[in-house]
UniProtKB/Swiss-Prot annotation:
The lineage of its organism: Bacteria, Bacillati, Bacillota, Bacilli, Lactobacillales. PROSITE patterns: RIBOSOMAL_L23. Part of the 50S ribosomal subunit. Contacts protein L29, and trigger factor when it is bound to the ribosome. Keywords: Ribonucleoprotein, Ribosomal protein, RNA-binding, rRNA-binding. One of the early assembly proteins it binds 23S rRNA. One of the proteins that surrounds the polypeptide exit tunnel on the outside of the ribosome. Forms the main docking site for trigger factor binding to the ribosome. One of its GO terms (molecular function) is structural constituent of ribosome. GO terms for cellular component: ribonucleoprotein complex; ribosome. It comes from Ligilactobacillus salivarius (strain UCC118) (Lactobacillus salivarius). This is Large ribosomal subunit protein uL23.
Amino acid sequence: MESRDVILRPVITEASMAELDNKRYTFDVDTRATKSQIKDAVEDIFEVKVAKVNVMNVKGKKKRMGRYEGYTKKRRKAIVTLTAESKEIKLFEE
């Protein structure tokens, strides 16, 4: 799996923005990606050093449109912690 295929998008929430001070970044990743693949992808794309990766699977929520029910897509979220000497990821600074 290519590095650009592993990381789908950054997660921009109030909680994830509060963790930027601790050098913790949150990404939506491919559901088949492992921790080591996520670590390699972040180091390759952003040229930083990763200390650890925490991963969680988020199940889809039930949604209704009139009388029709369905589910949103399940997703996998990764919280990446950078080392102390690593530089910041510029994607989140705006």
